[in-house]
Amino acid sequence: MATTYEEFSAKLDRLDEEFNRKMQEQNAKFFADKPDESTLSPEMKEHYEKFERMIKEHTEKFNKKMHEHSEHFKQKFAELLEQQKAAQYPSK
């Protein structure tokens, strides 16, 4: 059974969404484990804030890169479908 572009695209979109959701869940678990701020020294509080910012930034960058890869794969899949179509039905 041949996969259509729409099926391929929808599957990549679902995978992107699922991965993003899992990353957000992992981040939420990590942030929930942070000690109560009232027990932290100013230096440790600053450390946690920087670390949280870094995690959020890296998560955003990673999700953006995953989306870019998915779009690239969709483009390549569309090109392969066109090549296959051209091979099956060559113009005269």
UniProtKB/Swiss-Prot annotation:
InterPro entries: KMP11 (IPR004132). Keywords: Cytoplasm, Cytoskeleton, Microtubule. The keyword Hydrolase does not apply. It holds the Pfam family KMP11. The keyword Transit peptide does not apply. GO terms for biological process: cytoskeleton organization; defense response; positive regulation of cell population proliferation. It is found in: Cytoplasm; Cytoplasm, Cytoskeleton. GO terms for cellular component: cytoplasm; microtubule; microtubule cytoskeleton. Transmembrane segments: none annotated. Belongs to the KMP-11 family. May be involved in the regulation of the cytoskeleton through interaction with the subpellicular microtubules. May be involved in parasite mobility and attachment to the surface of the host cell. Behaves as a strong immunogen during infection. Monomer. This is Kinetoplastid membrane protein 11. It comes from Leishmania tropica. The gene is KMP-11.
